[in-house]
């Protein structure tokens, strides 16, 4: 499995979007232009460029992949017809992409002020307690949230079920979480074992 995180979001500008438009498939360009704001367009285009970089790193031949077309499963999750597995995530703090021969999920989230109602809706009792006793509950919540979202992405379903029980049976996955304190975000990568 390989992954890449990009967090120089100051590069989001109209000139960079124009450059990226020339590097993506027609399908991805159409998806990017569905965003009404420049930031969404940038993240959509930049994540595609990052995906191509990672796919080319994984190849055993010198032929470069110039573009890929996504297929979509019944839940709307994108996949590549002939593999490998991939996952893309973005937030205001950055963009994260993972590629693997096994099902993989990645999530990046900016750390923000904890909302108790959201904690009650998304975390089970044990998770809620671990957040409350943590010296930094905002970070503790985001760590758990990214684990849940990355796990569901690995499963290919997205958020379709009770989030409180998401990690109860996650023994089939390896989870790795990174905190970027300087840029104020958390990234979790989950790969099926």
Model-derived features with residue positions:
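Core catalytic alpha/beta fold that binds nucleotide/phospho-ligands
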Residues: 1-193
């Amino acid at each position: 499995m390989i992954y890449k995180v990009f967090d120089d979001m100051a590069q989001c500008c109209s000139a960079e979007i124009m450059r990226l438009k020339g590097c993506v498939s027609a399908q991805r360009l159409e998806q990017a232009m569905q965003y009404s704001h420049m930031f969404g367009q940038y993240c959509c285009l930049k994540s595609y460029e990052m995906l191509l970089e990672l796919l080319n790193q994984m190849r055993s031949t010198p032929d470069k992949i110039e573009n890929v077309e996504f297929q979509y499963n019944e839940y709307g999750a994108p996949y590549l017809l002939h593999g490998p597995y991939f996952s893309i995530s973005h937030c205001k703090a950055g963009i994260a992409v993972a590629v693997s021969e096994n099902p993989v999920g990645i999530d990046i989230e900016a750390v923000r002020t904890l909302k108790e109602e959201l904690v009650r809706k998304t975390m089970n009792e044990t998770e809620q307690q671990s957040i409350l006793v943590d010296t930094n509950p905002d970070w503790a919540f985001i760590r758990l949230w990214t684990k849940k979202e990355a796990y569901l992405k690995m499963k290919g379903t997205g958020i379709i079920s009770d989030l409180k029980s998401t990690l109860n049976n996650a023994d089939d996955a390896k989870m790795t979480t990174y905190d970027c304190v300087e840029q104020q975000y958390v990234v979790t990568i989950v790969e099926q074992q």
